[in-house]
Amino acid sequence: MTVVDRVTAADSSAPQTPLAEVASQFLPRIRDLARKMELDRRLDDDLVEDMEAAGLFSVIVPKRWGGAGLGPHELNEVMETVARGDVSTAWVTGFYNFHNWFLCRFPLEVQEELYAGRASVRCAAILSSPGTTERIGDQLRVNGRWGYATGMLHASHALVPVTIDDGLFWVIVPREKLEIIDDWDVAAMSATESVTIVAKDTVIPETWAMPFAKMMSATDHAGMFHGEEVMRLPFSALTSAISSLYVGALDAAVEISRERLNSASGVNSPPRIERPHARVRWVNAFQTARVMHMVRDHATQEAIEIARRGTPQTLEEEASRGLHGGMILRTVRETLRDLVDGNGSSGYRSDNHLRRMSADIAMLSTHAVHGEYDVMMDRYARWLLGMGLAPDDPGARMT
């Protein structure tokens, strides 16, 4: 399919099924595969292929390449929906979408090569200690080792951090030029394929490198030729998609717990629905889920409005938005834990979906970028109190 064909198809006046609805059609299949994927420590091959073909990895890819060209709210809906099926699958789905958005900020000739014949590029990306580079004419020799390359086992490329002239850059490296070390052996988020990758004297074009700050920027990048507003937003306007994963997991937990209210938890126990405490536990989770939706939607719209203003967000605004995400994560984690405890010993079976979701969300609360609750809350408190940046605050923030 040519670029013209893809643009024509994307601009068709025929009614399009909302991508959140498309995602919902995958839910039974995702749930059926969740335990197997957890044990295999990777997503199902056919599932990944079919989700990509359905457009679930190209939600925010511009229409020029055959993507949907949608925005933060629509990405939230897709993430929330997929998370109702499995948190690991949603995590990879979100990252594939984010990383496509990053790739669409590179120069046109780079994008033409990457998106030739496809509407999405399955790409891992890492934000950790940078590797090294050496210039060889108009090319770069890259060396480095990076862990947590989410989605790498199904990816064709990776974005890895390196230093170039003392600046932090992300460079695109094709999968065939990387060594993959399958060391992702964890008790939660097992299917995310967050393996370690290594580049040894890997040579890439210098045009495949971009400063990290430009990647996060609203308009200081080479992808401004795209017409969609999402390409004129900073990355901070997209990060509520991660919160949407938490919200979707809680929605699923409320649904599962509602179904289990009519079951007993012991030989001499009445059905849970006849016990006041069980009913209160469930309705608290139900209301918490409704509130988390409102917080997420408010945070998303607030970020979009700040971006449309055309000036960088202040530290106070960054802290305010961070508090939304931190509160959603911690609240969902605690609510899931409470629901698992209220489901009796069967809630701890290895194949229990509620148990898996609770463990996955608990693990995400330790994530170096999206978690570490105590560190982030102290940081946001300082910023809101006007104390400014501290020496150990990250110099490269996803804002």
Which residues does each PLM region occupy?
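Glycine-rich beta->alpha junctions and the first turn(s) of the following alpha-helix
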Residues: 188, 194-290
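Glycine-rich phosphate/cofactor-binding loops in nucleotide/flavin-utilizing enzymes
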Residues: 343-399
